[in-house]
């Protein structure tokens, strides 16, 4: 830690944290409900994930500074440079995602978007997974349905792999660089030098409207089946 005076600075809004921790809980619920055959709960959980992901994508363009893609998406070369210098000790004065972390966010959002979208069109045989059927499974051919069902299962394994890499990265930051990435994502603020400006935050009214629109869109799509 520096000799500079440190103050509490808000770096993450409640909306980003809602999406982050909400998806953590919902992934566990989705897995458990699939294993136990709680099909209605599984569909509800997947639709909620889709709602949060759609909202997060919109918030990535219209939301708070640290939530915006243009704030944290840098070139792949910048991400590689960041990883190459990972072992160098440095104070934890970053605001928002790192160059490498930004790409992980993009990968996770893509995987989390594919998962519920394929689930909408998926259907298992009655002897497997309690005969689960997505609300739109009848809108596609049996061949397409079978392909999307396989993709739905395979993509979940990719999500687990990406989540595992994310957890390992968080641990590496803690052990190697002494950077705590968890507490700021829990409470929204971190200790930063007094001279650093706080990032700009988006309108809560806009966020509420975007979240409501995402929920309505998902609900409308599920009623098409």
Task: Indicate where each model-derived feature is located.
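Membrane-embedded alpha-helical bundles that constitute the cytochrome b-like, heme-associated redox core
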Residues: 1-225
